Amino acid sequence: MSIRTPMKLGIPKGSLEEATINLLARSGWKIRKHHRNYFPEINDPELTARLCRVQEIPRYIEDGILDVGLTGKDWLLETGSDVVVVSDLVYSKVSNRPARWVLAVAGDSPYTRPEDLAGKRIATELLGVTKRYFADAGIEVNVQYSWGATEAKVVEGLADAIVEVTETGTTIKAHGLRIISEVLLTNTVLIANRAAWEDPCRRRKIEQIDLLLQGALRADSLVGLKMNVPTRCLDAVLDQLPSLNSPTVAGLRDNTWFAVEIVVDNGVVRDLIPRLREAGAEGIIEYALNKVI
């Protein structure tokens, strides 16, 4: 059965926007944005797309304004929205690693532990999570909402510490701050409205989206290798091969040669290709992968 009314897909606007649109493209969904328009085109008649603030997507999905969308685990915890968490999708603005919400203080401050901040002012956008973090630790602090430029609050004397999100810590250090604790590890999550999830047709579509997004993410860290190998060198070449599964080995028309194909981790290729060449492989081709399911 097909979906009669297109499902509404929430795409995070802002720091995750470009990475999410690229991921959707690799998964098979091309997004075409229009200037000053929050309703981009998508090449799927069963979907309509909406650009929304990542902080608002959980609420929109809970309320049925959106059927499915991508948001941060941090904002899901912050809002406490009642939604179905379909899967974790570990990617962020610049990498395929989780991001961290960290507690940071001035580099020259005397504070070295969260306990040292008792009675102090903490600035953050992640208000609820930060309050729970200190409450769980039994530390009384004054948590204040930050409307932006959070890293500057300590420098300007507006706060004694901040809780801010970071991928690498570079921006934190650039503002003369020092991380003293990790508050939360976060990543992107695919979430769905509960009514949409209970509908068989819509659930099938959500599961399709999840499958292809996961496949595209998995492919990011993998590459394919093809090569021709003389029969006399086949065992030596196969001994060099790590693989996602067993390599594909096929005889060629010239029965003194084999074609070998594998999928390997991108990080091993620079060392692997020279070893394969030394073992007797020829015509080695490396190619990118769009999805690995």
UniProtKB/Swiss-Prot annotation:
Its main location: cytoplasm. GO terms for cellular component: cytoplasm. PROSITE patterns: ATP_P_PHORIBOSYLTR. Feedback inhibited by histidine. InterPro entries: ATP-PRT_HisG_long, ATP_PRibTrfase_cat, ATP_PRibTrfase_CS, ATP_PRibTrfase_HisG, HisG_C, N-reg_PII-like_a/b, N-reg_PII/ATP_PRibTrfase_C. It comes from Nitratidesulfovibrio vulgaris (strain ATCC 29579 / DSM 644 / CCUG 34227 / NCIMB 8303 / VKM B-1760 / Hildenborough). Pfam families: HisG, HisG_C. Its EC number is 2.4.2.17. This is ATP phosphoribosyltransferase. It catalyses: 1-(5-phospho-beta-D-ribosyl)-ATP + diphosphate = 5-phospho-alpha-D-ribose 1-diphosphate + ATP. One of its GO terms (molecular function) is ATP phosphoribosyltransferase activity. The gene is hisG. NCBIfam families: hisG (TIGR00070), HisG_C-term (TIGR03455).
